[in-house]
């Protein structure tokens, strides 16, 4: 019987720990403040921003919402970020992605002060991760490491396969597993003999962006499967990149969708807010 890794419960534990930490900081007259910028009214982005605001409220983190119209120019957005960079009372800045086509994402990410880069996307944050230095960690991969550790799953010495090579999940995930002394392979759309590689994995992280792509033919008996995907199927039901029902009886542990990786991403964003405020700001 597979262990169902409960991201909701584990993220709740982390938020409770952070709530106590923020309360302690407040008793010293120190405040953690996150500025969240959203351009346009993409429904999914609006939901994510709402979830981040709720998590801030729960942890005692002050949040500032900047809801900009879709026609906001790149220059206007960069000017706002620079204003927030200069504000001593703002300890973290997050720009909700994706951005409209007329705004260059990389330019926006690079404009955020690396000391306030709570998403962990700035080249300075990514560089620190790649050479093993302390710094902001990309939230989803950091959340996955916490899921594994807090579920008693050892990473050291394990054969780890990451399916997907995005800058947000795949690449930083591989680096974090390497940092934990896993033996890491990255697969992607051009990988040949994919199932031969995935069937070697003790820990398989699936972030490929295709609904129910991973079936039991790709998984060895007793593997741990982490599903990063989030989609709606033809019946409007949430599902991941893993065909959960097909795989669940073959694995030793698996994350569900929803309730697995998703809540951890927000918990680790809150963790980054507190970490950064303490390290750089207050």
Swiss-Prot record:
Pathway(s) the chain acts in: One-carbon metabolism; tetrahydrofolate interconversion
SUPFAM superfamilies assigned to the protein according to its UniProt record, in alphabetical order: Aminoacid dehydrogenase-like, N-terminal domain (SSF53223), NAD(P)-binding Rossmann-fold domains (SSF51735)
Phosphoprotein is among the record's keywords: no
Alphabetical list of InterPro entries matching this protein: Aminoacid_DH-like_N_sf, NAD(P)-bd_dom_sf, THF_DH/CycHdrlase, THF_DH/CycHdrlase_cat_dom, THF_DH/CycHdrlase_CS, THF_DH/CycHdrlase_NAD-bd_dom
EC numbers, comma separated: 1.5.1.5, 3.5.4.9
Swiss-Prot/TrEMBL GO biological process terms: L-histidine biosynthetic process; methionine biosynthetic process; purine nucleotide biosynthetic process; tetrahydrofolate interconversion
Signal peptide: none
Reactions it catalyzes: (6R)-5,10-methylene-5,6,7,8-tetrahydrofolate + NADP(+) = (6R)-5,10-methenyltetrahydrofolate + NADPH; (6R)-5,10-methenyltetrahydrofolate + H2O = (6R)-10-formyltetrahydrofolate + H(+)
Annotated GO CC locations: cytosol
Transmembrane annotation, as ranges: none
Keyword terms, alphabetized: Amino-acid biosynthesis, Histidine biosynthesis, Hydrolase, Methionine biosynthesis, Multifunctional enzyme, NADP, One-carbon metabolism, Oxidoreductase, Purine biosynthesis
Gene3D superfamilies, A to Z: Leucine Dehydrogenase, chain A, domain 1, NAD(P)-binding Rossmann-like Domain
Family that this chain belongs to: Belongs to the tetrahydrofolate dehydrogenase/cyclohydrolase family.
Self-association and partners: Homodimer.
The name this protein goes by in its record: Bifunctional protein FolD
Gene behind the chain: folD
């Amino acid at each position: 019987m597979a262990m169902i890794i409960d991201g909701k419960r584990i993220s709740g534990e982390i938020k409770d720990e952070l709530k106590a930490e923020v309360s302690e900081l407040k008793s010293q007259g120190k405040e953690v403040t996150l500025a969240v910028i959203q351009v346009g009214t993409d429904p999914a982005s609006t939901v994510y921003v709402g979830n981040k605001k709720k998590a801030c409220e729960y942890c005692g983190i002050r949040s500032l919402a900047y809801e900009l119209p879709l026609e906001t120019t790149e220059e206007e957005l960069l000017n706002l970020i620079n204003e927030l960079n200069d504000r001593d009372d703002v300890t973290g800045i997050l720009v909700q992605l994706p951005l409209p086509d007329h705004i260059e994402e990389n330019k926006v990410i690079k404009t955020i002060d690396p000391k306030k880069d709570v998403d962990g996307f700035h080249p300075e944050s990514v560089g620190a991760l790649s050479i093993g230095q302390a710094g902001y960690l990309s939230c989803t991969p950091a959340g996955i490491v916490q899921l594994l550790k807090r579920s008693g799953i050892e990473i050291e010495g394990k054969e780890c396969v990451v399916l997907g090579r995005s800058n947000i999940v795949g690449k930083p995930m591989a680096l974090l597993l390497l940092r934990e002394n896993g033996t890491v392979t990255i697969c992607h759309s051009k990988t040949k003999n994919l199932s031969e590689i995935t069937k070697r994995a003790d820990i398989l992280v699936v972030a490929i962006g295709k609904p129910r792509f991973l079936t039991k033919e790709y998984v060895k008996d007793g593997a741990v499967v982490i599903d990063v995907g989030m989609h709606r199927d033809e019946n409007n039901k949430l599902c991941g990149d893993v065909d959960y029902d097909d795989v669940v009886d073959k694995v030793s542990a698996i994350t569900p969708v929803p309730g697995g990786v998703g809540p951890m991403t927000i918990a680790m964003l809150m963790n980054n807010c507190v970490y950064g405020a303490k390290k750089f700001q207050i």
